[in-house]
């Protein structure tokens, strides 16, 4: 299964705070960034390193740097923006590619309305960010788009994932690893994750919240 649930105590604690029904926009936004940063730490743990020499205070010293492919972070609009600053706090040199995906609330199917990909994205590691992996339709559509653009290495980071969304991504793209703070119970009849976080986009941007 292309999924890794990160059960670090800091992540569990912060995610618990995010589940509160009365959480403020400010606190939800800050926690989304913090958990996004912690997921980034785990999702980049296997990046290749190479050694090189520098002049230190006591002479020449061998140090390491990240080698291999450069990174592009791909927030799925709009909610993915809420994790972006946290991710970039750890990989500030990454380029940002934005993908806008909207979900039909009746059919629960996704359609892409915006794509702003960095040049030569086919030579980069693409790291998709989106707070919720619910039905999986938005994630699958984004991965489809990135692969069509030539991306060969793609990872995804989500705050909360539903089993239905995980299964959808696994069926369509079994080569894509998903990192999540929590695998939740299920989707409700409206396609929202239970227990979930509610509508993450609304909570990040302070717009109308839905009870889901």
From Swiss-Prot:
Uracil binds at residues 193, 198-200. It is an enzyme of class 2 (transferase). One of its GO terms (molecular function) is GTP binding. GO terms for biological process: UMP salvage; uracil salvage. 5-phospho-alpha-D-ribose 1-diphosphate binds at residues 78, 103, 130-138, 199. Its cofactor is Mg(2+). The keyword Thylakoid does not apply. It holds the Pfam family UPRTase. Keywords: Allosteric enzyme, Glycosyltransferase, GTP-binding, Magnesium, Nucleotide-binding, Transferase. Its EC number is 2.4.2.9. It comes from the Bacteria. The keyword Lyase does not apply. Binds 1 Mg(2+) ion per subunit. The magnesium is bound as Mg-PRPP. Allosterically activated by GTP. It catalyses: UMP + diphosphate = 5-phospho-alpha-D-ribose 1-diphosphate + uracil. Pathway: Pyrimidine metabolism; UMP biosynthesis via salvage pathway; UMP from uracil: step 1/1. Belongs to the UPRTase family. HAMAP family: Upp_B. Catalyzes the conversion of uracil and 5-phospho-alpha-D-ribose 1-diphosphate (PRPP) to UMP and diphosphate. This is Uracil phosphoribosyltransferase. The lineage of its organism: Bacteria, Pseudomonadati, Pseudomonadota, Gammaproteobacteria, Pseudomonadales.
């Amino acid at each position: 299964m292309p999924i890794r649930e990160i059960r670090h105590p800091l992540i569990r604690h912060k995610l618990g705070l995010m589940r509160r029904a009365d959480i403020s926009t400010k606190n939800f936004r800050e926690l989304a960034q913090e958990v996004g940063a912690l997921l980034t730490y785990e999702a980049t743990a296997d990046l290749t390193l190479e050694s090189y020499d520098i002049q230190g205070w006591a002479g020449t010293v061998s140090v390491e740097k990240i080698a291999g492919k450069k990174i592009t972070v791909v927030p799925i609009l709009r909610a993915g923006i809420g994790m972006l600053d946290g991710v970039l706090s750890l990989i500030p040199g990454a380029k940002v590619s934005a993908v806008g995906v909207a979900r039909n609330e009746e059919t629960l199917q996704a359609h892409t309305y915006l794509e702003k990909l960095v040049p030569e994205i086919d030579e980069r590691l693409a790291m998709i960010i989106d707070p919720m992996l619910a039905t999986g339709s938005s994630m699958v559509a984004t991965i489809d788009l990135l692969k069509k653009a030539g991306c060969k290495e793609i990872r995804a980071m989500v705050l909360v994932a539903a089993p239905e969304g995980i299964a959808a991504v696994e069926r369509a793209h079994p080569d894509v690893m998903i990192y999540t703070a929590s695998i939740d119970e299920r989707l409700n009849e409206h396609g929202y994750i239970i227990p979930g976080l509610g509508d993450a986009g609304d909570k990040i941007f302070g717009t109308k919240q839905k009870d889901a």
